[in-house]
Amino acid sequence: MNRKPVASGKKYGGMQRNLWRPRVCCNSSSVSLRYFSPYHSVVNSHQDSLGARTLGVRTLAWVSLLTVGGFAACAKQAGQTGASSNGGAMARRGTPAIPTTAPGQFPQGWHLPAGQTAAFAQQAMAVSNSPEASKASVEILKAGGNAVDAAVALGFALAVTWPEAGNIGGGGYMVIHMADGRSATLDYREVAPALATRNMYLDASGNLTDKSVDGHLSVGVPGAIAGLAEALKKYGTLPLSRVMQPAIRLARNGFVVDSGLGRSIAGGATRLRKWEGGKLFAPDGVAVKTGTLFKQPDLARTLQAIADGGARAFYEGWIADSLVAELKRGGGIITKADLAKYTPKWRTPVITKYRDYSLVAMPPSSSGGVTMTEALNILEQYPKLPTYGSTAYFHVVASAFQRAFIDRNAKLADPDFVKVPMDLLTSKKYAKALRATIDDKRATPTKELEPKLEAAAREGSHTTHYSVVDSQGNAVATTTTLNNSWGSGVWVRGAGFMLNDEMDDFAAQPGKANMYGLVQLEQNKIEPGKRMLSAMSPTIVLDQNGNVLLVVGAAGGPTIITGTAQVILNVLDNHMNISDAMRAPRVHHQALPDSITFETGGIAASVLDSLRKMGHGMKQQAALTNVNAIMRVKGGWEGVPEPRRWGGAFGY
């Protein structure tokens, strides 16, 4: 790979910033360019996903996107550009739509192993954990579909190309903003089956078993197919059979396993071998490897049946028979009546003003929108946040998260079963009162704020988020999950898909932690037909004129809320461009455990010492959250897959 150091640069915001000097080379099979990348200006030396080495603030990278299924072409040919964990390209740099300044230097040694690159597109963009799924979404956009059509296509494609979390056997949430000003939120979260009981996961001594996280009894009634079909019906423009074609093709003809999926399968192989799905993902006990052509004929048959017969083909036909038979085989309790009864729900969006911007977020049964809104409202009480990276900054941000999570765990649940004080939790007056409880000199123990909670230590985090925008200015933020990585582990034989273990997101034992360490009270107890509380936080940020500025969301259990919020803070308060906003080190506080979790190397040693002296417990973790985002810039859109993991951003 050819690369030379940048010969010159200019000072920008007190830091050395690189000048973009693209040289585009086009032919019928590729689009490639040389560029000086400003995205590496605050990152110390590391190897990025393209193999280019960042040296301080000076980088020259040579990238080339070869044609994959006819997707790459020159900008003048309206071709697709993109970036992914396996390489990518950027047609040209866009100027941010809002003023940005260089953030303070990140701690020395801070680096992100995946080293994702951003993609720029003039008209439309899709970002997800799977390059193949993102490209499937762009195929629909280029065929004349809108953002909802493309989001539905992406959702089905993820069931093929990112099966640890992308799914048809789970559920999720979708936030939609149309260019005409309409906003909508769709709840297609799983529900507890009719035979579910309050204490179904407790043993004879009243202790919590692992049956809520593993095996047939952990499965909630899936909502994914009903949700995707409902979104398409109300806001899409293309038929279901058309938007499902890319997913069906990927399942039937196969696709080459990329490094992200290869690692995912390898990481889950031991668990997968316990179940029927191991025959597909680990034939003869050996995990499918990166570079393998991977076909899923049973899943292709299932998807084709849904494309031909609509969502009811999943909930009433042979697929439903196969699902129920598999669950009965292992002691599960979902019936065909449970499946036939499932209905996704349109809910009133959580819309709040933050600074000069508007946030459109998900209401309960997701806790994400309300909890994030409460935290941001608290932080808005500071006319200006402390400098990013300082002791004061991490103290106030973590303290806001702590208070919002206390309310999340004590007050939020399925609104069809529990009266949720939405007006209180999202009010500026309430936020002002909570801000007054933050001591700027010391940490406040959670027990002082809420004595009722008790903690236990269980952790985990696997979900997937995707963001889509189209040429008309419509936008979709969708988060979907099986809960744990590879869900319950239960494989529907003959149908080719994995089922969720979402029942663990109920408070199976109120006051005790679930798999994610979240402590919840009676309002989230198990009840038949009830949706379990979730942390998923798909969010769309609108500018002062009501136009889409940012489409964002994340995976990562409870860190979804704090990770999504921090990317928003980095853009709106810390004035970072979207790539820096994604790269910036993150922290997390969920009330219990009563500590700040921080990314290894992400906080300067002196700041860590100061936070400990203030009374904060400090716990390090290799990486926090898996965010995928799109931001409007002058002349188009920039899409950034999570730099801590892998994914793909593609557009045209």
Regions found by a protein language model. Give the residues of each.
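Bacterial N-terminal signal peptides that target proteins for export
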Residues: 19-20, 33-38, 42-61
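Noncatalytic scaffold domains of N-terminal-nucleophile
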Residues: 87-135, 139, 147-309, 314-316, ...
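Bacterial N-terminal signal peptides
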Residues: 58-70
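Internal maturation/activation junctions in enzymes
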Residues: 103-104, 382-482, 491-495, 502, ...
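Cysteine-centered motifs
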Residues: 25-26
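Active-site rim segments in enzyme catalytic domains, especially the processed small/beta chain
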Residues: 160-185, 333-335, 475-544, 574, ...
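Extended C-terminal subregions enriched in glycine
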Residues: 530-531, 564-565, 573-622
